[in-house]
Design a protein with these regions (language model features):
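Short acidic-glycine-tyrosine-enriched beta hairpin
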Residues: 68-85
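Structural motif
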Residues: 34, 43, 62-64, 71, ...
Length: 127
């Protein structure tokens, strides 16, 4: 992924090419930030990112961000930022397409390593 985009990116097309659930793929870079798309269904894992905020934007469907003291329900077009250090668990009761914006240093599942954890190298694979 080049830091200088030479063409526009269709988020709809990009997310349709993602084969695995909970496997974000980088579609753009802005300074020290990756813009990613993902297909999600079910739940990921309770985790936190000690030093990074994480932005979720729902492109299609519904997403619930479970927090230790409640949950945030997101519909298409809704955005929510999970502040650094806050434990959270993304959940989609049916397939949902999301856009994530996070610093390049952000680990996929933060402080939790699971079979769903994807490395940055995996997220950078071409679609």
């Amino acid at each position: 992924m080049s830091s200088k985009m030479r063409q526009s990116v269709s988020l709809t097309d990009a997310v349709s090419k993602v084969q695995e659930l909970w496997s974000p793929r980088v579609v753009a870079e802005v300074d020290d930030v990756y813009v990613k798309v993902a297909r999600v269904h079910g739940q990921l894992a309770w985790h936190s990112h000690k030093n990074e905020d994480e932005l979720f934007l729902v492109l299609r469907g519904r997403l619930r961000i479970e927090l230790e003291h409640g949950a945030i329900e997101l519909n298409e077009g809704d955005v929510f930022v999970v502040p650094k250090g806050v434990r959270h668990n993304p959940v989609a009761d049916s397939e949902c397409h999301i856009l994530l914006i996070e610093r390049k240093s952000t680990l996929h599942t933060g402080d939790a390593i699971t079979e769903q954890t994807r490395s940055v190298a995996e997220q950078l694979r071409p679609l």
